[in-house]
């Protein structure tokens, strides 16, 4: 079976979907699994042994489009090569118009996603052929696993795995950073893709102070 995972970004969203990738591969070891992702965050998935084909796209031309015909025109040239994989099924973990559009353009006859109430853009439901209803209150990782399980018919795994690929270059870079550290250290990540997701600098300062007081 040829399976397409549609999860374009962001970094956190990709990490939340990795357990579903692991579960699909464990349940279907002979499946051909592709993942379509935004170019800007594709490094998270490059070299991942569980992925047969990593398809990197730039969906800027789709942003802000209000009509599906406009979105299809804007992104069509980039995604025509999707059809050569002859996907049997596409699973839209994103729940947006642009992700559902990519699933549609892939040529997959079965296009699975969350039920309308679980979609971030509910009107994108029209591009899906099948949906899975999951409880709203469960963790997003388990929501994604429930979608994958419902779409492909496997039993939910007991163990949640995060198959993050690392290259030798990543290891060298991390070792160099650790070598410069003196004693124990903590890692704080103040960055974010959206202003609404950024924590105040003062709060990072308070956190750093408390870490130092407790563990310094």
Annotate each predicted stretch with a short phrase.
Residues 1-216:
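Catalytic machinery of carbohydrate-active enzymes
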